Amino acid sequence: MIDINLIREKPDYVKERLATRDKELVSLVDKVLELDKRRREIIKRLEALRSERNKLSKEIGKLKREGKDTTEIQNRVKELKEEIDRLEEELRKVEEELKNTLLWIPNLPHPSVPVGEDEKDNVEVRRWGEPRKFDFEPKPHWEIGERLGILDFKRGAKLSGSRFTVIAGWGARLERALINFMLDLHTKKGYKEICPPHLVKPEILIGTGQLPKFEEDLYKCERDNLYLIPTAEVPLTNLYREEILKEENLPIYLTAYTPCYRREAGAYGKDIRGIIRQHQFDKVELVKIVHPDTSYDELEKLVKDAEEVLQLLGLPYRVVELCTGDLGFSAAKTYDIEVWFPSQNKYREISSCSNCEDFQARRMNTRFKDSKTGKNRFVHTLNGSGLAVGRTLAAILENYQQEDGSVVVPEVLRDYVGTDVIRPE
């Protein structure tokens, strides 16, 4: 959530930054200013009416002691009460609308973020590794997986419908190996491993910015008013909701493996085949809760931590800085890491690493006590995939495929998997 004081004091700046995302967002700022003005007018009027009521109440007591008639003043007090009740209800509605409007406004892009409309305006930062030159036509991962008997799309559809897959045999072992490898790597770097709930309350999703804007993309358990998590970022970041942290305990590094559940409401026709875009997929998440002064240094380190997974797996990739029009709702700055897919002859996103600054912290009310000023300040929150497991598995199948249909297991995974090569069963 954007600081309403910033909107009050620098409305033109806020509008300018939001317009780099989408010009239509400017109208939300005007609505906030209008509601905020009305709110303050009501509060001022209420204070005046309450003051008058208090004075008259004292006057009634005085007149009664003197044995004088108080009918006229009592009638006025009754009128004041009715007016105060009406204004208090109006204030409640205005404040609710103001809060809801603020919840729909995305984060302000950091000034360093390149201005652009969509992914075509993203800026490549660096590449690592050389894409393998095949002496045969590389097959797509879904074809490789089906031939190996490790990806079963028909049975996945039989069980749950489209965009669900059964991963079996050596594929299941490879999936588990990737999860353990990623968690082992991150915990050695100081990330604390967490096993969070997969069902969360609505306010938890409001905290990280999925609600209210992205409700259509979430799975909801109506009877219990709980949502399946779309990413472990949601429970991990909210662990410190409504808390005041000690400055000396920052930074906090967290990691978790969870399945993620997404309706993919806006993905019709995209990545229909394979396991690139699923309703349920595994992911290892990285979350940082840090001091505001260090958050951009922490972002660069976060990207490096995600990159190291791909480097150790020997998978070629590139790092891309997202432009303003392609930024996620809660992010002030984001780097995407894209891994090479030979069958598509292009890089595909496998990790997104973002600094949300204090945007999520304001929604969660997560603060720390500043040792210099003694005042409470909002923390900065960061998150990144470390990595999306299914996409990593797909990238391994494609980059390590052999002409005979087998797949070589990356060296760092062999002890986890228990074999050097996966062959057709």
Curated annotation (Swiss-Prot):
A single GO cellular-component term on record: cytoplasm
Keyword Nucleus appears in the UniProt entry: no
EC number: 6.1.1.11
Positions contributing to ATP binding: 262-264, 349-352
Record field: catalytic activity: tRNA(Ser) + L-serine + ATP = L-seryl-tRNA(Ser) + AMP + diphosphate + H(+); tRNA(Sec) + L-serine + ATP = L-seryl-tRNA(Sec) + AMP + diphosphate + H(+)
PANTHER family: SERINE--TRNA LIGASE (PTHR43697:SF1), SERYL-TRNA SYNTHETASE (PTHR43697)
Domain free text: Consists of two distinct domains, a catalytic core and a N-terminal extension that is involved in tRNA binding.
Self-association and partners: Homodimer. The tRNA molecule binds across the dimer.
Protein function: Catalyzes the attachment of serine to tRNA(Ser). Is also able to aminoacylate tRNA(Sec) with serine, to form the misacylated tRNA L-seryl-tRNA(Sec), which will be further converted into selenocysteinyl-tRNA(Sec).
Family of this protein: Belongs to the class-II aminoacyl-tRNA synthetase family. Type-1 seryl-tRNA synthetase subfamily.
Protein name per UniProt: Serine--tRNA ligase
Organism placement in taxonomy: Bacteria, Pseudomonadati, Aquificota, Aquificia, Aquificales
